[in-house]
Design a protein with these regions (language model features):
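Nucleotidyltransferase catalytic core that binds NTPs
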Residues: 2-168
């Protein structure tokens, strides 16, 4: 049930990242964000100068599969500034998460830069359960590269191998 001050207004947040690949940690951030916002846009930043572990198309397909039954989550890709993408999708907040103080200092710096460039855009830091705070995309990539099982680090039902040669 919406409170009176939210009638007619959706609270939309953008959760930007490379998501290469999308992990249980990312999934937990989205779950926390959905407690605060009506809609969360998972926005995959596409750096055309980098070749990712997974193609951008594969990352998008993987995340869309995770949220196929959740109309409150949208998945997009972008090559512009995150603040510009936030405006394009109607977001008033950027959702981020931190695992430690180093992450916090970095996110605070980015949040202040965004506040300077986009006065109407807030940054919201969410904390994820301790069970997933150690999970990162780089950990998944490294373990996979050395032949280790990464299934427990990915959202349920996601097999990384299904996306490695996606679209080729």
């Amino acid at each position: 049930m919406r409170t009176i001050y939210n009638i007619g207004m959706q609270r939309v947040a953008i959760f930007p990242g490379s998501f290469d690949p999308f992990t249980k940690g990312h999934e937990a951030v989205v779950e926390e964000a959905l407690k605060l916002f009506d809609r969360v846009v998972v926005a995959i930043g596409h750096n055309i100068q980098k070749r990712g572990f997974l193609t951008v198309e594969a990352r998008k397909a993987l995340i869309e599969r995770v949220y196929k039954d959740n109309p409150r989550v949208e998945v997009t890709t972008y090559t512009t500034l995150t603040g510009d993408e936030a405006r394009r999708v109607g977001a008033t907040a950027i959702v981020r998460s931190v695992r430690n103080m180093t992450d916090f200092d970095y996110e605070r710096t980015i949040a202040n830069a965004n506040r300077f460039a986009y006065k109407d855009l807030s940054t919201v830091i969410v904390l994820v359960p301790v069970e997933v705070e150690h999970i990162s995309s780089s950990l998944v990539r490294e373990l996979h590269t050395f032949g280790r099982d990464v299934e427990g680090l990915l959202p349920e039902g996601i097999a990384l191998g299904d996306y490695l040669n996606f679209g080729e």
